[in-house]
Amino acid sequence: MHKYQTHWVEHSIVKILSSAGKKYIALMAGGMSAEREVSLVSSEGVSKALIELGYSVTFIDMGADITVRLQEIKPDIVFNCLHGTYGEDGCLPGLLNIMRIPYTHSGMLSSALAFNKIHSRSWFLTNNINMAESIVVNKSDNIKNDPMKRPYVIKPLTQGSSIGVEVIFAEDNFNFADYDFPYGDQVIIEQYIKGRELQVAVLNGKALGVLEIKLLKNRFYDYETKYTEGFADHLCPAPLPANLYEKLLIESEKIYKTMNCKGPARAEFILEEQTNKLYALELNTHPGMTPLSIVPEIAAYAGINFTNLIEEIIKTASFES
Protein backbone atom coordinates (compact mmCIF):
# COMPACT_ATOMS: atom_id res chain seq x y z
CA MET A 1 0.00 0.00 0.00
CA HIS A 2 1.40 3.39 -1.00
CA LYS A 3 1.29 6.11 1.64
CA TYR A 4 1.11 9.84 0.96
CA GLN A 5 3.00 12.31 3.12
CA THR A 6 1.63 15.85 2.89
CA HIS A 7 3.94 18.84 3.42
CA TRP A 8 2.67 22.41 3.55
CA VAL A 9 4.77 24.88 1.60
CA GLU A 10 4.11 28.40 0.40
CA HIS A 11 1.29 28.56 -2.19
CA SER A 12 0.83 24.81 -2.52
CA ILE A 13 0.69 21.32 -1.08
CA VAL A 14 3.32 18.81 -2.10
CA LYS A 15 2.17 15.19 -1.99
CA ILE A 16 4.91 12.59 -2.00
CA LEU A 17 4.28 9.03 -3.13
CA SER A 18 7.08 6.70 -2.13
CA SER A 19 8.07 3.83 -4.40
CA ALA A 20 11.36 2.00 -4.19
CA GLY A 21 13.71 1.31 -7.08
CA LYS A 22 12.66 4.04 -9.52
CA LYS A 23 13.81 7.60 -10.11
CA TYR A 24 12.25 10.38 -8.10
CA ILE A 25 10.18 12.77 -10.22
CA ALA A 26 8.93 16.27 -9.42
CA LEU A 27 5.71 16.82 -11.39
CA MET A 28 5.55 20.56 -12.06
CA ALA A 29 2.10 21.94 -12.86
CA GLY A 30 -0.37 24.73 -12.15
CA GLY A 31 1.69 27.88 -11.99
CA MET A 32 0.65 31.47 -12.53
CA SER A 33 -0.31 31.65 -16.20
CA ALA A 34 -3.71 31.93 -17.87
CA GLU A 35 -3.37 28.21 -18.70
CA ARG A 36 -3.16 27.14 -15.07
CA GLU A 37 -6.33 25.02 -15.14
CA VAL A 38 -5.31 23.18 -18.31
CA SER A 39 -1.96 22.39 -16.70
CA LEU A 40 -3.61 21.01 -13.57
CA VAL A 41 -5.94 18.78 -15.59
CA SER A 42 -2.99 17.51 -17.66
CA SER A 43 -1.06 16.74 -14.47
CA GLU A 44 -3.79 14.43 -13.15
CA GLY A 45 -3.35 11.92 -15.96
CA VAL A 46 0.42 12.30 -15.99
CA SER A 47 0.60 11.66 -12.23
CA LYS A 48 -1.44 8.46 -12.54
CA ALA A 49 0.77 7.23 -15.37
CA LEU A 50 3.98 7.95 -13.47
CA ILE A 51 2.68 6.08 -10.42
CA GLU A 52 1.60 3.17 -12.62
CA LEU A 53 5.14 3.09 -14.03
CA GLY A 54 6.50 2.81 -10.50
CA TYR A 55 8.10 6.24 -10.12
CA SER A 56 8.24 8.18 -6.87
CA VAL A 57 6.28 11.36 -7.57
CA THR A 58 6.08 14.77 -5.92
CA PHE A 59 3.48 17.21 -7.21
CA ILE A 60 4.54 20.86 -7.13
CA ASP A 61 2.22 23.77 -7.87
CA MET A 62 4.81 26.18 -9.21
CA GLY A 63 5.26 29.45 -7.34
CA ALA A 64 7.92 32.08 -6.70
CA ASP A 65 9.72 29.77 -4.25
CA ILE A 66 10.30 27.05 -6.82
CA THR A 67 14.11 27.05 -6.43
CA VAL A 68 13.86 26.47 -2.68
CA ARG A 69 11.38 23.64 -3.14
CA LEU A 70 13.54 21.87 -5.70
CA GLN A 71 16.55 22.16 -3.41
CA GLU A 72 14.49 20.67 -0.57
CA ILE A 73 13.14 17.63 -2.41
CA LYS A 74 16.13 16.98 -4.74
CA PRO A 75 14.31 15.18 -7.59
CA ASP A 76 16.11 13.11 -10.19
CA ILE A 77 13.86 14.50 -12.95
CA VAL A 78 11.36 17.33 -13.33
CA PHE A 79 8.32 16.48 -15.47
CA ASN A 80 7.38 19.87 -16.92
CA CYS A 81 3.59 19.79 -17.06
CA LEU A 82 3.25 23.57 -17.05
CA HIS A 83 1.52 25.46 -19.85
CA GLY A 84 2.01 29.10 -20.70
CA THR A 85 4.23 31.66 -18.97
CA TYR A 86 7.24 30.43 -16.95
CA GLY A 87 6.85 26.77 -17.93
CA GLU A 88 6.40 26.83 -21.68
CA ASP A 89 8.35 29.99 -22.51
CA GLY A 90 11.80 28.71 -21.54
CA CYS A 91 11.96 30.14 -18.00
CA LEU A 92 11.71 26.83 -16.13
CA PRO A 93 14.10 24.99 -18.49
CA GLY A 94 16.60 27.83 -18.00
CA LEU A 95 16.38 27.51 -14.22
CA LEU A 96 16.71 23.73 -14.38
CA ASN A 97 19.76 24.07 -16.64
CA ILE A 98 21.41 26.21 -13.95
CA MET A 99 20.41 23.73 -11.23
CA ARG A 100 21.53 20.82 -13.43
CA ILE A 101 18.28 18.92 -12.98
CA PRO A 102 17.14 16.82 -15.96
CA TYR A 103 13.69 17.80 -17.25
CA THR A 104 11.19 16.70 -19.86
CA HIS A 105 10.06 18.63 -22.94
CA SER A 106 12.07 21.12 -24.98
CA GLY A 107 14.96 23.20 -23.70
CA MET A 108 15.21 26.90 -22.93
CA LEU A 109 15.85 28.35 -26.39
CA SER A 110 13.55 25.95 -28.26
CA SER A 111 10.71 26.67 -25.84
CA ALA A 112 11.20 30.43 -25.96
CA LEU A 113 11.36 30.41 -29.75
CA ALA A 114 8.20 28.35 -30.19
CA PHE A 115 6.25 30.29 -27.56
CA ASN A 116 6.74 33.75 -29.07
CA LYS A 117 4.68 34.05 -32.24
CA ILE A 118 6.88 36.76 -33.79
CA HIS A 119 10.10 34.79 -33.35
CA SER A 120 8.60 31.43 -34.33
CA ARG A 121 7.08 32.96 -37.46
CA SER A 122 10.47 34.34 -38.50
CA TRP A 123 12.01 30.92 -37.89
CA PHE A 124 9.33 29.16 -39.94
CA LEU A 125 9.76 31.53 -42.90
CA THR A 126 13.56 31.26 -42.73
CA ASN A 127 13.15 27.50 -43.09
CA ASN A 128 10.72 27.83 -46.03
CA ILE A 129 7.61 26.87 -44.07
CA ASN A 130 4.54 28.51 -45.62
CA MET A 131 2.52 30.81 -43.32
CA ALA A 132 -0.41 33.19 -43.67
CA GLU A 133 0.24 36.90 -44.17
CA SER A 134 0.60 38.73 -40.86
CA ILE A 135 1.67 42.00 -39.25
CA VAL A 136 2.65 43.04 -35.72
CA VAL A 137 0.57 45.76 -34.07
CA ASN A 138 1.74 47.65 -30.99
CA LYS A 139 -0.65 49.24 -28.52
CA SER A 140 1.31 52.48 -28.90
CA ASP A 141 0.47 52.56 -32.62
CA ASN A 142 -3.04 53.75 -31.66
CA ILE A 143 -4.58 52.16 -34.74
CA LYS A 144 -8.19 53.22 -35.19
CA ASN A 145 -9.23 51.14 -38.21
CA ASP A 146 -8.87 47.49 -39.18
CA PRO A 147 -5.13 46.79 -39.52
CA MET A 148 -5.83 44.21 -42.23
CA LYS A 149 -8.66 43.37 -44.61
CA ARG A 150 -11.26 41.18 -42.91
CA PRO A 151 -11.44 38.37 -42.02
CA TYR A 152 -8.36 38.41 -39.82
CA VAL A 153 -7.16 36.84 -36.58
CA ILE A 154 -5.88 38.67 -33.49
CA LYS A 155 -3.32 36.61 -31.58
CA PRO A 156 -1.47 37.50 -28.36
CA LEU A 157 2.26 36.96 -28.78
CA THR A 158 2.75 34.59 -25.88
CA GLN A 159 -0.40 32.68 -24.98
CA GLY A 160 -1.39 29.11 -25.72
CA SER A 161 -4.66 27.15 -25.79
CA SER A 162 -6.09 29.89 -28.07
CA ILE A 163 -6.38 32.18 -25.03
CA GLY A 164 -7.01 35.72 -26.24
CA VAL A 165 -7.41 34.70 -29.88
CA GLU A 166 -10.18 36.49 -31.76
CA VAL A 167 -11.35 36.08 -35.36
CA ILE A 168 -12.86 39.21 -36.89
CA PHE A 169 -15.25 38.52 -39.76
CA ALA A 170 -16.71 41.06 -42.20
CA GLU A 171 -20.11 41.06 -40.50
CA ASP A 172 -18.77 41.49 -36.96
CA ASN A 173 -19.54 44.65 -35.01
CA PHE A 174 -15.94 45.24 -34.00
CA ASN A 175 -13.95 48.46 -33.77
CA PHE A 176 -10.20 47.93 -33.49
CA ALA A 177 -9.87 51.31 -31.76
CA ASP A 178 -11.65 49.72 -28.78
CA TYR A 179 -9.35 46.70 -28.55
CA ASP A 180 -7.72 46.80 -25.10
CA PHE A 181 -4.68 44.51 -25.59
CA PRO A 182 -5.50 42.26 -22.60
CA TYR A 183 -2.41 40.03 -22.96
CA GLY A 184 0.40 42.47 -23.61
CA ASP A 185 1.25 45.53 -25.67
CA GLN A 186 1.79 43.65 -28.94
CA VAL A 187 -0.39 41.34 -31.02
CA ILE A 188 -0.05 39.45 -34.27
CA ILE A 189 -2.72 40.26 -36.85
CA GLU A 190 -2.94 37.31 -39.22
CA GLN A 191 -4.90 36.69 -42.38
CA TYR A 192 -7.76 34.29 -41.65
CA ILE A 193 -7.49 31.13 -43.73
CA LYS A 194 -10.71 29.21 -44.19
CA GLY A 195 -9.92 25.53 -44.37
CA ARG A 196 -9.34 22.24 -42.61
CA GLU A 197 -7.69 22.21 -39.17
CA LEU A 198 -4.90 19.62 -39.15
CA GLN A 199 -2.73 18.62 -36.19
CA VAL A 200 0.42 16.49 -36.14
CA ALA A 201 1.89 14.86 -33.03
CA VAL A 202 5.67 14.56 -32.89
CA LEU A 203 7.41 12.47 -30.25
CA ASN A 204 11.18 12.41 -29.86
CA GLY A 205 11.65 13.59 -33.45
CA LYS A 206 9.18 11.22 -35.11
CA ALA A 207 5.79 12.35 -36.43
CA LEU A 208 3.16 9.88 -35.20
CA GLY A 209 0.16 10.83 -37.30
CA VAL A 210 -2.24 13.52 -38.48
CA LEU A 211 -5.59 14.39 -36.89
CA GLU A 212 -8.30 16.61 -38.37
CA ILE A 213 -10.55 18.79 -36.21
CA LYS A 214 -14.16 19.25 -37.29
CA LEU A 215 -15.82 22.20 -35.58
CA LEU A 216 -19.36 21.53 -34.39
CA LYS A 217 -20.38 24.75 -32.61
CA ASN A 218 -17.95 27.66 -32.57
CA ARG A 219 -16.53 29.57 -35.53
CA PHE A 220 -12.91 28.65 -34.87
CA TYR A 221 -10.81 26.31 -32.73
CA ASP A 222 -10.97 28.42 -29.57
CA TYR A 223 -10.34 27.64 -25.89
CA GLU A 224 -13.92 26.47 -25.32
CA THR A 225 -13.78 24.12 -28.30
CA LYS A 226 -10.44 22.67 -27.24
CA TYR A 227 -11.51 21.77 -23.72
CA THR A 228 -15.26 21.13 -23.91
CA GLU A 229 -16.57 17.74 -24.94
CA GLY A 230 -19.00 17.87 -27.86
CA PHE A 231 -17.64 21.05 -29.44
CA ALA A 232 -15.48 19.29 -32.05
CA ASP A 233 -14.98 15.92 -33.70
CA HIS A 234 -11.49 14.48 -34.01
CA LEU A 235 -10.80 12.44 -37.14
CA CYS A 236 -7.73 10.26 -36.65
CA PRO A 237 -6.15 9.49 -38.97
CA ALA A 238 -7.15 12.57 -40.95
CA PRO A 239 -8.89 11.61 -44.22
CA LEU A 240 -6.30 13.00 -46.62
CA PRO A 241 -4.60 11.84 -49.82
CA ALA A 242 -1.52 9.78 -48.98
CA ASN A 243 0.92 12.29 -50.47
CA LEU A 244 -0.53 15.18 -48.45
CA TYR A 245 -0.59 13.11 -45.25
CA GLU A 246 3.07 12.26 -45.76
CA LYS A 247 3.92 15.90 -46.49
CA LEU A 248 2.41 16.92 -43.15
CA LEU A 249 4.52 14.34 -41.33
CA ILE A 250 7.70 15.50 -43.08
CA GLU A 251 6.99 19.21 -42.51
CA SER A 252 6.28 18.61 -38.82
CA GLU A 253 9.50 16.67 -38.29
CA LYS A 254 11.39 19.41 -40.12
CA ILE A 255 9.97 22.13 -37.85
CA TYR A 256 10.65 20.04 -34.74
CA LYS A 257 14.24 19.26 -35.68
CA THR A 258 15.23 22.73 -36.90
CA MET A 259 13.92 24.19 -33.61
CA ASN A 260 15.92 21.53 -31.72
CA CYS A 261 12.93 20.28 -29.71
CA LYS A 262 12.79 17.20 -27.51
CA GLY A 263 10.01 15.08 -26.09
CA PRO A 264 6.46 15.75 -27.35
CA ALA A 265 5.24 18.54 -29.62
CA ARG A 266 2.22 19.33 -31.74
CA ALA A 267 2.39 21.05 -35.13
CA GLU A 268 -0.71 22.92 -36.30
CA PHE A 269 -1.70 23.52 -39.92
CA ILE A 270 -4.57 24.83 -42.03
CA LEU A 271 -5.35 23.32 -45.44
CA GLU A 272 -6.98 26.14 -47.40
CA GLU A 273 -10.44 25.20 -48.61
CA GLN A 274 -10.28 26.57 -52.16
CA THR A 275 -6.64 26.09 -53.16
CA ASN A 276 -5.56 23.08 -51.04
CA LYS A 277 -2.54 25.16 -50.03
CA LEU A 278 -1.00 24.20 -46.70
CA TYR A 279 -0.25 26.84 -44.07
CA ALA A 280 1.64 26.24 -40.83
CA LEU A 281 0.20 27.93 -37.74
CA GLU A 282 2.61 27.07 -34.91
CA LEU A 283 4.53 24.40 -33.03
CA ASN A 284 3.42 23.71 -29.47
CA THR A 285 6.28 22.34 -27.36
CA HIS A 286 4.02 21.66 -24.34
CA PRO A 287 0.96 19.94 -25.80
CA GLY A 288 -1.88 19.15 -23.44
CA MET A 289 -2.25 15.79 -21.75
CA THR A 290 -5.95 16.17 -20.84
CA PRO A 291 -8.66 13.61 -21.76
CA LEU A 292 -9.50 15.76 -24.82
CA SER A 293 -5.92 16.48 -25.87
CA ILE A 294 -4.67 15.69 -29.34
CA VAL A 295 -1.17 14.28 -28.82
CA PRO A 296 -2.33 11.37 -26.61
CA GLU A 297 -5.07 10.61 -29.13
CA ILE A 298 -2.67 10.49 -32.08
CA ALA A 299 -0.18 8.48 -30.01
CA ALA A 300 -2.92 5.93 -29.25
CA TYR A 301 -3.62 5.65 -32.99
CA ALA A 302 0.11 4.98 -33.48
CA GLY A 303 -0.03 2.18 -30.89
CA ILE A 304 1.33 4.11 -27.90
CA ASN A 305 -1.04 4.15 -24.93
CA PHE A 306 -1.01 7.05 -22.47
CA THR A 307 1.20 5.36 -19.89
CA ASN A 308 3.77 4.39 -22.50
CA LEU A 309 3.62 7.92 -23.93
CA ILE A 310 4.60 9.33 -20.55
CA GLU A 311 7.41 6.76 -20.27
CA GLU A 312 8.76 7.82 -23.68
CA ILE A 313 8.70 11.46 -22.59
CA ILE A 314 10.59 10.60 -19.38
CA LYS A 315 13.30 8.84 -21.39
CA THR A 316 14.32 12.14 -23.03
CA ALA A 317 14.76 14.05 -19.75
CA SER A 318 18.00 16.04 -19.75
CA PHE A 319 19.42 19.46 -19.00
CA GLU A 320 21.49 21.72 -21.25
CA SER A 321 25.04 22.49 -20.15
Curated annotation (Swiss-Prot):
It comes from the Bacteria. PROSITE patterns: ATP_GRASP, DALA_DALA_LIGASE_1, DALA_DALA_LIGASE_2. One of its GO terms (biological process) is regulation of cell shape. Binds 2 magnesium or manganese ions per subunit. It is found in: Cytoplasm. ATP binds at residues 147-199. One of its GO terms (cellular component) is cytoplasm. Gene3D superfamilies: 3.40.50.20, ATP-grasp fold, A domain, ATP-grasp fold, B domain. Its cofactor is Mg(2+); Mn(2+). Its EC number is 6.3.2.4. The keyword Ligase applies. It is an enzyme of class 6 (ligase). Cell wall formation. This is D-alanine--D-alanine ligase.
